[in-house]
Amino acid sequence: MARGQNHAATELVHVGFGNFLAMNKVLAIVTPGSAPIQRMIREGKKKGIIIDITSGRRTKAAVFTETGNIMLVAITPEAVAGRVNTRSARLARTAGDKTS
């Protein structure tokens, strides 16, 4: 493995329609309503860095990744955060059960 890489398991979060996000590669999850974010999405489409995983639904969040891509998802940033927190709490509880 390359120097400086994280050996921990990648946390995948379901974002609908059979799609998942690798949370260790996510920089920010934002709502697409503001003018600056809409501008970034428009420019991203021109550059070819947009990954649309909405399956034709309305975009409710834009996910910025370490690789410079912008992923468009059909669930809200709050829903993504809730899924991360729910899964993390479940994993912590399971790990606590194993140490007892």
List each language-model region with its residue ranges.
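Plant-biased recognition of short, low-complexity, intrinsically disordered N-terminal tails
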Residues: 1-9
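Short aromatic-glycine motifs in intrinsically disordered, low-complexity regions
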Residues: 9-20
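Phosphoinositide-dependent membrane-docking surfaces
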Residues: 23-31
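Hydrophobic alpha-helical segments that drive targeting, anchoring, or assembly
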Residues: 24-25, 43, 47, 69
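Compact, glycine-rich, soluble single-domain proteins
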Residues: 36-52
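Short, structured protein-protein interaction patches enriched in aromatics and acidic/basic residues
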Residues: 52-66
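C-terminal structural segments of small proteins and small subunits
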Residues: 62-99
